[in-house]
Amino acid sequence: MIEVKGVTKSFDDFTALDNVTCNIAEGCIYGMVGSNGAGKSTLLRVLSGIYKADKGEAIIDGINVYENTYMKNKLVFVADELFFLAGANMKSMAKFYSSIYDNFDMDRFTELTKTFGLD
């Protein structure tokens, strides 16, 4: 169960989410539709614990996701833009993510980079 309770998130003078409340039952699939700047990605970032809501809370399976290592290890968020540390390559990014995610599989990373001819 995903619960969003009165979530508000602002950036300077722009309010991306304004008192958003919704419940998504286990096994349900929803899509979000909206124009650029409507708050879709912001809501997903709050749900994945990347952003902290200014007000309200995001709860998954009864657990608040922000600053919760256990829950973050169970979630993945793939943004529409790639994130790389300045000057980083794939191996340094893999090392970075392995330091954040306990279940990051370096052997699988190496296998996939070889399979797809990446370096």
PLM features per residue range, with description:
Residues I2-V4, L17:
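Conserved structural motif at the start of ABC-family nucleotide-binding domains
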Residues G56-E67, M71:
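Conserved ABC transporter NBD signature motif
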